[in-house]
Amino acid sequence: MRCLPVFIILPLLIPSAPSVDAQPMTEDDVPLASFHEQTLQELWNKRPCCPLIPGCCR
């Protein structure tokens, strides 16, 4: 009875084949890493300036 959850969860963890809806990237698509980096940069620029900590204000 202990193995029953394993047999239920294991098939969910196995990656499936790409679906038919998968489409190649277009010119307008932005890679997720680039979007994440841009978001971090915007958050960094919005931080309040703290003159007592070197390198805080850029």
Swiss-Prot record:
Under the heading InterPro entries, the entry gives: T-conotoxin
Regarding how it is modified after translation, the entry says: Contains 2 disulfide bonds that can be either 'C1-C3, C2-C4' or 'C1-C4, C2-C3', since these disulfide connectivities have been observed for conotoxins with cysteine framework V (for examples, see AC P0DQQ7 and AC P81755).
Keyword hit for Signal: yes
Which residues constitute the signal peptide according to the record?
Answer: 1-22
- Highest taxon of source: Eukaryota
Residues spanning the membrane: none
Q: In which tissues is it expressed?
A: Expressed by the venom duct.
Q: Which UniProt keywords apply?
A: Cleavage on pair of basic residues, Disulfide bond, Secreted, Signal, Toxin
- Where does this polypeptide localize? Secreted
Residues of the propeptide region, as annotated, are: 23-47
Molecular function, one GO term: toxin activity
Could you state one GO cellular component term attached to this entry?
A: extracellular region
Give the domain note: The cysteine framework is V (CC-CC).
By sequence similarity, the record places it as follows:
Belongs to the conotoxin T superfamily.
According to UniProt, the name of this protein is: Conotoxin Leo-T2
* Native species: Conus leopardus
